[in-house]
């Protein structure tokens, strides 16, 4: 399937953001310290505990089971939005949104820095 045929690849349909709106999004690099199966989730997912350095440990639910195993995620750097309000997902509270790109099959591929950075480093 070509990238234009998948719904995740449609052109932006939202109005442009103002720079001041973008500046409100706090994206940081963290290191996964724990990853377990989220058995209670409706769709296959993992429960992640992520170290964001001075921001501390934060938890997230991530639907990334197609390309990652829990053991492979521990020690991995990820990028997440850290200033959304906590979200209840079944019995779990997700505190951050781990970011990824969708491939043509609609599966999430995690974003990560290509050079070493300190946990808690701000994305800008």
Q: Where do the model's predicted regions map?
A:
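Phosphate-backbone binding interfaces of nucleic-acid-interacting proteins
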Residues: 1-124
